[in-house]
Amino acid sequence: MIAVKKDKINGDALGTGRRKSSVARVRVRPGSGKITINGKSIEEYFVNDQHRYAITETLEAAGLTESVDLLIRVSGGGMTGQAGAVRMGLARALCSHDEALHDPMREGSFLTRDSRMKERKKPGLRGARRGVQFSKR
């Protein structure tokens, strides 16, 4: 069971998603299917089709493509991390919006946090794992 988060003023459903170093805050309200990310449309913000699909796939799984508006604020990381953060935040917000969507979101693994993070650079190495080239002579 996920905690239901609603805006106290206008009743919007809220959800927060994280992926790598990206954080997305998603607000779902009844509407016509308009998606706004950091003040831009989804086509302007996510140029890559795969990034856009990560978001629209969540709406399609819920069956709410044309019936809700999304206001999204996302920061940190790159485009792939941000798309993943928005995907998870949207799934959480949709579960707050309608409790019946929890099972389809869980089955589609939209609510599963991707825990993979960048591995830190180790001392004495050039990167996280890459060492200095070995010379026998």
From Swiss-Prot:
Gene3D superfamilies: 3.30.230.10
Gene Ontology molecular function: any one: structural constituent of ribosome
Composition bias, Basic residues: 118-137
Region of interest (Disordered), ranges: 114-137
InterPro entries registered for this protein in UniProt: Ribosomal_Su5_D2-typ_SF, Ribosomal_uS9, Ribosomal_uS9_bac/plastid, Ribosomal_uS9_CS, Ribsml_uS5_D2-typ_fold_subgr
UniProt-listed GO biological process terms: translation
One GO cellular component term noted in the UniProt record for this chain: cytosolic small ribosomal subunit
The keyword Nuclease appears for this protein: no
Keywords: Ribonucleoprotein, Ribosomal protein
SUPFAM superfamilies: Ribosomal protein S5 domain 2-like
Pfam families: Ribosomal_S9
Keyword Disulfide bond: no
HAMAP family, per database record: Ribosomal_uS9_B
Family: Belongs to the universal ribosomal protein uS9 family.
Protein name: Small ribosomal subunit protein uS9
Protein's gene: rpsI
